[in-house]
Amino acid sequence: MDLFEYQARDMFEAHGVPVLAGIVAHTPEEAKAAAEKIGGVTVVKAQVKVGGRGKAGGVKVAKTAEEALEHSTNILGMDIKGHTVNKVMIAQGADIAEEFYFSVLLDRANRNYLAMCSVEGGMEIEQLAVERPEALAKIAIDPAVGIDQAKADEIVAAAGFAEELRGKVADVILKLWDVFKKEDATLVEVNPLVRTGAGEIVALDGKVSLDENADFRHVHHAHLEDKDAADPLEAKAKAQDLNYVKLDGEVGIIGNGAGLVMSTLDVVAYAGENHGNVKPANFLDIGGGASAEVMANGLDVILGDSQVKSVFVNVFGGITACDAVAKGIVGALAELGSSANKPLVVRLDGNNVEEGRRILTEANHPLVTLAATMDEGADKAAELANAAK
């Protein structure tokens, strides 16, 4: 889960990272009041989870509260790379002497953590990495050790900080690592990290991405979710503990196990080439549980997508046997009643497959078609979806 800048700022402050005053505002009037409360020069910053805000006109300096009102009026409702600005942060103006860069992230390729640091901040870090890679220090972080004082000192030395700044910057890096570790983040980035005219090191802008797999350890993270931006079907599925991702297609997919579901997406996409180029409408992994309740919840989410024209249920019976899956499907259709109004193609294999097929055959539901293989099921589901387009 990516955080808004104001959320990252608040999280930094909670962990002792030095930040400037910042207040989120949803209306121009709130923005004016925030500017009056902070006092002096402020910056009106669009709150969207995308870069390039400044170039798009989403960041403006306000010398007075009236200017903050004017700028926020123009920024609120603005579209920045497909993201609508619904709120702004009124931030205290900074006396910037130097701009730096720091981030720590999950390095999936090397199964490690990676710290990146540069004395040249304030610009697109991707551009710096390409044009002047020597200006960006990259230090591998052992997950078992993390960033301790010695590692923080190594990072600032590798980045080329002036001797008189190294202690202060290292102290901020240790606190940013505290954010990364204790909040179960996959990214903590500050660009720019600045030295003020008074010689203080301050995090002026921040990005934080949290690992949603660790949500069970962080009940307080729930309030950070952007309810406005979340896809309503994905939000509904999440509330029911379903692993669901909406896609842009017509064939709903239900499977057990991420690998099987991913394979099903590929097979359906391939079959769709012969049937009007229909595509998978979603990823939905019900895992090991295929009870009537889980099936009903899954079908309810999928059938709530108006783009879905057919559903392909592809299950390999293991711990959860095929007869239990079949009973779950029959029970789900009974529970959903008239809202289950799209054809279902069901392919079962594995533990107790014959009993599962018998249950579905005897149920004789008009919407259910049995398929012997995954290829056959994908082809039939694509055919039905194309016919209903």
Curated annotation (Swiss-Prot):
Manner of cofactor binding, per the entry note: Binds 1 Mg(2+) ion per subunit.
Catalytic activity of the protein: succinate + ATP + CoA = succinyl-CoA + ADP + phosphate; GTP + succinate + CoA = succinyl-CoA + GDP + phosphate
UniProt-annotated binding residues for substrate: N256, G318, I319, T320
Transmembrane segments: none
Record has Calcium as a keyword: no
Description of how the protein assembles with itself and partners: Heterotetramer of two alpha and two beta subunits.
Top EC category: ligase
Protein name as annotated: Succinate--CoA ligase [ADP-forming] subunit beta
Cofactor(s), names only, from the UniProt record: Mg(2+)
Enzyme nomenclature, EC number: 6.2.1.5
SUPFAM superfamilies per UniProt: Glutathione synthetase ATP-binding domain-like, Succinyl-CoA synthetase domains
Pfam families in the cross-refs: ATP-grasp_2 (PF08442), Ligase_CoA (PF00549)
Species this chain originates from: Paenarthrobacter aurescens (strain TC1)
PROSITE patterns: ATP_GRASP, SUCCINYL_COA_LIG_3
GO molecular function, one term: succinate-CoA ligase (GDP-forming) activity
Keywords from the named record: ATP-binding, Ligase, Magnesium, Metal-binding, Nucleotide-binding, Tricarboxylic acid cycle
Boundaries of every ATP-grasp domain copy: 9-236
Residues that, per the record, bind Mg(2+): N191, D205
Known role: Succinyl-CoA synthetase functions in the citric acid cycle (TCA), coupling the hydrolysis of succinyl-CoA to the synthesis of either ATP or GTP and thus represents the only step of substrate-level phosphorylation in the TCA. The beta subunit provides nucleotide specificity of the enzyme and binds the substrate succinate, while the binding sites for coenzyme A and phosphate are found in the alpha subunit.
Protein family (similarity comment): Belongs to the succinate/malate CoA ligase beta subunit family.
Gene Ontology cellular component list: cytosol; succinate-CoA ligase complex
Gene3D superfamilies in UniProt: ATP-grasp fold, A domain (3.30.1490.20), ATP-grasp fold, B domain (3.30.470.20), Succinyl-CoA synthetase domains (3.40.50.261)
